[in-house]
Every structure is written in structure tokens, then in C-alpha cells.
Amino acid sequence: MAELTISSDEIRSAIESYTQSYTPETSIEEVGVVTDTSDGIAHVSGLPSAMANELLEFPGGVLGVALNLEDREIGAVILGEFAEIEEGQQVRRTGDVLSVPVGDKFLGRVVNPLGQPIDGLGEIEAEEQRVLELQAATVLQRQPVEEPLATGITAIDALTAIGRGQRQLIIGDRKTGKTAVCIDAILNQKANWETGDPTKQVRCIYVAIGQKGSTIAGVKAALEEHGALEYTTIVAAPASDSAGFKWLAPYTGSAIGQHWMYQGKHVLIVFDDLTKQAEAYRAISLLLRRPPGREAYPGDVFYLHSRLLERCAKLSDEMGGGSMTGLPIIETKANDISAFIPTNVISITDGQVFLESDLFNKGVRPAINVGTSVSRVGGAAQTKGMKKVAGSLRLEMAQYRELEAFSAFASDLDAASLAQLERGARWVELLKQDQYSPVPVEDQIVSIFLVDQGYYDSVPVGDIRRFNAELLEDLHRSAADAFKSIEGGKVLEGEAAEAIKAATDKFKQGFLASDGSRVVNEAAAGELGHEEVESLSVTRKHVEK
């Protein structure tokens, strides 16, 4: 029988080989326990190493965000369905802070505040993950707002112009057309998008916070119908969502926009509306037992909005020159703009467009109150052509509103006042616009120029909108070269201005008012100065049968 021999070297090498290839199946992780839960908030004991804003994993794959870090427990906001979360369940750390996927594939899609698609069109291929709580651009990384962003709304482009990188507040009571103004601004970017020029293209983001599901579906349908959905992303946190989703939705939208901004691209983002975000944050804070302040809002509600809106900027050329323009919407109660949230956001933004319910009910739409609406960027964000023709429009409109209120109590008015009322009524009609019908800047300049020069004075007020629409259609044919010379908002002057005037004179000869009368083709009255007005014989209408 052969002798069995075992080499010690073979034994050693076999053991070494086994130990090197062995992978332990156990791991160390922190596990917490839900101590109580209600209304989308969970208190978790344990997890001593959890970070602020860290994602926590609850049973069933439900995620939460660690907001309150206390000695013995964590206060977390549950993102998603919280009905199944119960006391005693285990909670695990993920090691990740809150972030969302971003990229060009998000254009044309509807996502929730976690960046997950909810439009039934399949998964979205992300380019990268972007942290939600990201520091805004520093002062040295910015440049002044000087590049205009046309909204297609004559009243805004002429009176409270918006520039790329600006934050312009849209404020007013419910049902005054706030959302419609912002949707029109998105629709007006279609012409720039179709050029294919990256310096002109504007990517749009519409953030719906606490809106009815049917309202969000209506916005999506309107964008789709007008061909604007291809360059727009919708971030939806409808009224049925938890307070956590409504709180996060604006930050998700801004993270998607910042991704493009830091690539040197231009972005327009609409927050509809931040009042509901503040109310959701108030609910979260009260449930987390944070001390309430004015109107029961927590002490950091100003920071909630300031750190969001400060992300809108026009970056310096060294940073790529990209921009993100913000249109936050705030809903007021009974036109009270002195309430807590409205005053907070007014102080953060670069101006506001105030929509008034009284004007809206009178049929003035968009119902913009010229007296309380302002752009702190001012003429820097206007094209040269618009700045020239609309320079005195704000003053004229303010004087008209004041005189209109006075005339309600006065029976006899002098010629100057009558002339101002007649001209003001025509300005009001010109600034009215139908929904989803943005006006190109060239058409705006020509219309304002002709009213300013007195060409609309002989047209009955009730026919102004029809006259303006038919005149512009005719001018695009008969004075096409003049329109080409003011493309991009160039100044209307010289031969182009004379061609517009001549074509307008010719058009007026064939225009019939609604009562069948012909508009007299009188010489342009020009701007109505005080000395000229006093010597001017003013009548209510100039028509000849």
C-alpha cells in the first residue's frame, strides 16, 4: 500500500487561495425604526450618522428626506405614498443626498419631483444626476441682465420688459390670467427654437405646484397643440400629491434648468405657484414641530424662496454665458400684495407684473395694472426699437388711469383731457390680447409707433383691435421691407418709418368701421404735448359718411 504524503506547502497555498477568493456576505449598515408617522411625516429613532437632506429608504421602496436631525430621532418627509408606513418598521440610510436626473431627453416629457416620468412614454435616459440643494452662482460668476427675452405680450414687452436671467414675479388674485401670461411667454419661444441657433433657442420648464390634475393636463394639451411641448419640460406636483412633493417640485425644475444653463444654453422656468409651495412647507414644518412665525409660516420661509430664485441668473462669459429666467407666480387674496409671502417674493425678484381682478372683469386681458407693475431691469432688457417707441407709454397709461377715475365725477373736461382720454382708450384696446396668441416684437413696435403718431385716433375705440389686426396683415404685404429692417427689435426710422406711414394711409382709405362709416385719413397728429393739445380742436370721433 502506497504511503499518503501531504505537503505543508500545498496546504498553505490552498488556504491562501481560498481566503483570497472568499467574499463575506454580511455587511454593516445603520438601521432605524419608525417611532410614529402621520400626514406624510415619519419620526425615526436611530441612524446617528444620517446627513441633512439624506434620502432614507422605507419598506416597499418608499423614499423619505431627513429634515430634522435631533439627538434621539430624525424627522423625515415621506416622498410618495405614506399610507403603508407604520410604527416599528425598519428604515435604512442610502448615503445619497436628494438629487434628480437631468438631460436633453427631458424635453417634451412630464415628470414628478423625483424626475420620474409620469406621462406613460417610458423611461428617460439621463445625462447625469444633479443635487437639488446646490449653491447658486456667485456674484463674480454673473453678468448684468441686458439681453431681452420677448414674451409676445405687448403690455409686458413694452412696459415691464423681461431680460434673460431676470426674475419677474407674476402676481394677482385667482382667475386673473397668471398662468395664461406664462404659457404665452413659453409659446413665444417657438420661432427662436425653430431657428436651430443655440444663442436664440430657449428651453422652457413649467413647474405645476398644487394645481388640479385637469389644469396640468390642459396646459400640456395647449403646449402640444401649439408645437411648444418639444422644447418644454413639465414638472408636476398636483394637488393630490403629498406636501413633500409640492415642496420639492420647484427645486427639481430649477435643477433641470441649471443643467442647461451651465452648458451655456438659455432657459425659461415658470413656478406655478410658489404660494402653494410655501403652504406645503408650512404644513411640513408644523408637523415637524418647528416653531411657527408670522401667519404660522416657519422662520426660514424667506430662505425657502430666496435660495430657489437666486439660481436664476445670466452667467458670465467665462462660465459659458448661459441664462435661466424665472417667472414665479404668487396668488394674492383680495389684491392684497402686502401679505407675508407676496412681500417676501417681491423683495427677492427683479420686478413684478400685477394682474388685477377688476381689470380682468372689465375685459382688459391681460389684466395688467400699469401703476403697480414694474421691472427693475428696465430699459436695459428692451430692444432699441421698443425703447424708442414705448418710452413714454407707461406715463401715458398711468395718467390715463388717473384721468379716467377723475372723469367719472366730472361732467366738463377741457380739450387736453378729452384728447388724453381718447388716446388712452385706444392704448388700452391695443394692449388687449387673446390667449395663446403671442405677438412678434416687430408687430408690437409698428403698432405702438402708429398709435403714438396719431394714426389710430380717427378709428372708433370698438374697432381698434380689428383695425390693428387687418392693418398688420396688410403691412406685412405692402411694407415687407420695412418689417425686415426692424427684425430683432431694431429702431423704426427713416425710409422704413415713411413706408409704414404711407401704407397705413392707404389702408385707412379702404377700412370700414363697424357702423359702416369710413375712417377719415387725417394727417398724423404726432405726440400730444401740452402746448399742442390746448390749441387742438378735439372731437370724440373723426368719421365721414
Curated annotation (Swiss-Prot):
InterPro entries: ATP_synth_asu-like_sf (IPR023366), ATP_synth_asu_C (IPR000793), ATP_synth_asu_C_sf (IPR038376), ATP_synth_F1_a_nt-bd_dom (IPR033732), ATP_synth_F1_asu (IPR005294), ATPase_a/bsu_AS (IPR020003), ATPase_F1/V1/A1_a/bsu_N (IPR004100), ATPase_F1/V1/A1_a/bsu_N_sf (IPR036121). Its EC number is 7.1.2.2. GO terms for cellular component: plasma membrane; proton-transporting ATP synthase complex. Its main location: membrane. One of its GO terms (molecular function) is ADP binding. The record marks 373 as: Required for activity. It is found in: Cell membrane. It is a peripheral membrane protein. Produces ATP from ADP in the presence of a proton gradient across the membrane. The alpha chain is a regulatory subunit. F-type ATPases have 2 components, CF(1) - the catalytic core - and CF(0) - the membrane proton channel. CF(1) has five subunits: alpha(3), beta(3), gamma(1), delta(1), epsilon(1). CF(0) has three main subunits: a(1), b(2) and c(9-12). The alpha and beta chains form an alternating ring which encloses part of the gamma chain. CF(1) is attached to CF(0) by a central stalk formed by the gamma and epsilon chains, while a peripheral stalk is formed by the delta and b chains. This is ATP synthase subunit alpha. It comes from Nocardia farcinica (strain IFM 10152).
